[in-house]
A protein has these predicted regions:
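Positively charged n-region of N-terminal signal peptides that target proteins for export
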Residues: 1-4, 20
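Sec-dependent N-terminal signal peptides
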Residues: 4-13
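Short, exposed beta-strand-loop hairpins at the edges of beta-sheets
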Residues: 168-171, 175-187
Length: 198
């Protein structure tokens, strides 16, 4: 009899816990209902500890704003950068002339001049320096809540507690920003690109 009561209590407890847990897809759907319109977010996906946002906004391609050349960007940031110029091959593309800006802490940004856009385009990067601020105000060292508040209006905080990586991907899936959290702080921002240069 005691075993039967114990089994019934265990099953009832599992049912309550299961009902309290919200599936990843349900979380993603709820988060979609709270997106900020200026980011033109078209989809949100959650897989284990990673949330991926797909957006049509050009802020993913131009996270530091739209610049006609590197010198204007360097002057505007008022930060001390070391600058390397060279050629790099990305994926199966031809080699491209790349400007690499570096900070003393190891942060770097690879950029190139887009001949079709006439603007500086992002290729690669890792930002850990808290002084490097994206156009939308994001920077390393911010709280997780502040980062999510940039992309979403009010939402259940419990939905992002277990998120350790936030990926913001351009609609064409060519450029992305990867925000990696350690605890409740933004540890670093990564920039990835799958551009084809032709």
């Amino acid at each position: 009899m005691k075993k039967l009561i114990l089994v019934i209590a265990l099953i009832a407890n599992m049912g309550v816990v299961g009902a309290q847990q919200v599936s990843s897809r349900a979380k993603a759907v709820l988060m979609m209902s709270h997106v900020r319109p200026e980011y033109m977010i078209k989809d949100v996906k959650i897989y284990t500890d990673t949330m991926t946002i797909y957006t049509l906004a050009d802020m993913v391609v131009y996270p530091f704003g739209k610049w006609e050349n590197m010198d204007k960007y360097i002057t505007a940031t008022q930060l001390l950068w070391s600058r390397d110029i060279g050629y790099k091959r990305y994926f199966d593309s031809m080699e491209v002339a790349v400007n690499t800006l570096r900070r003393l802490d190891g942060s770097y940004i690879d950029m190139y001049y887009g001949i079709h856009t006439g603007l500086v385009e992002m290729l690669d990067g890792k930002i850990t320096d808290t002084n490097i601020v994206l156009n939308n105000g994001l920077h390393a060292g911010m709280s997780k809540q502040d980062v999510f508040n940039v992309y979403f209006k009010q939402f259940p905080k419990s939905y992002v507690n277990d998120i350790h990586v936030l990926k913001v991907i351009s609609g064409a899936n060519e450029v992305g920003q990867i925000y990696t959290f350690k605890g409740t702080k933004l540890r670093h921002i990564g920039i990835i690109s799958r551009y084809k240069y032709y």
